[in-house]
Amino acid sequence: MDNKMRLEFLAKSENEGFARVSVSAFIAQLDPTIEELTDIKTAVSEAVTNAIIHGYECDESKVVIIEASICEDEISITVEDNGIGIENLEEAREPLYTSKPELERSGMGFTVMETFMDSLEVYSEKNKGTKIIMKKKMNT
């Protein structure tokens, strides 16, 4: 492993931007293209927003954890919560599915993450939390 970071922050919506910027600053050492940087920032934003809104149901006292690691030219980003978990993971990963239609969310979070990253793994257990692992190979 070339480098690694870990970040913990309260599940407040204003910290989503902080998470994006922190991961961006960390991967700057790989000299990413603007497109790569935008893709990663968008995927991080979606994962953190899911943790806050769905995992913790907007309970700002809870903590979201992000870990990022660089191994050669690949970035791996893990976003984890200890929230309510996802009851039906297969259904949740379907485009346009949302468990909270009253919030006017698009239901495209997982689809966006899958589109902008090379791989997406989601692990979830009801009442235990969710862990999202995203990877992207950089064209450095």
Swiss-Prot record:
The cysteines covalently paired via disulfide bonds are: none
Enzyme class per UniProt: transferase
For molecular function, the Gene Ontology terms on record are: ATP binding; protein serine kinase activity; protein serine/threonine kinase activity; sigma factor antagonist activity
Nuclease recorded as keyword: no
Question: What reaction gets catalysed by this protein?
Answer: L-seryl-[protein] + ATP = O-phospho-L-seryl-[protein] + ADP + H(+); L-threonyl-[protein] + ATP = O-phospho-L-threonyl-[protein] + ADP + H(+)
What biological process terms from GO does the record include? asexual sporulation; negative regulation of sporulation resulting in formation of a cellular spore; sporulation resulting in formation of a cellular spore
Q: What EC number(s) is this enzyme filed under?
A: 2.7.11.1
Q: Name one Pfam family in it.
A: HATPase_c_2
Key words of the record: ATP-binding, Kinase, Nucleotide-binding, Serine/threonine-protein kinase, Sporulation, Transferase
The UniProt similarity line reads:
Belongs to the anti-sigma-factor family.
Role: Binds to sigma F and blocks its ability to form an RNA polymerase holoenzyme (E-sigma F). Phosphorylates SpoIIAA on a serine residue. This phosphorylation may enable SpoIIAA to act as an anti-anti-sigma factor that counteracts SpoIIAB and thus releases sigma F from inhibition.
Query: By what name is this protein known?
Result: Anti-sigma F factor
Organism of origin? Clostridium perfringens (strain SM101 / Type A)
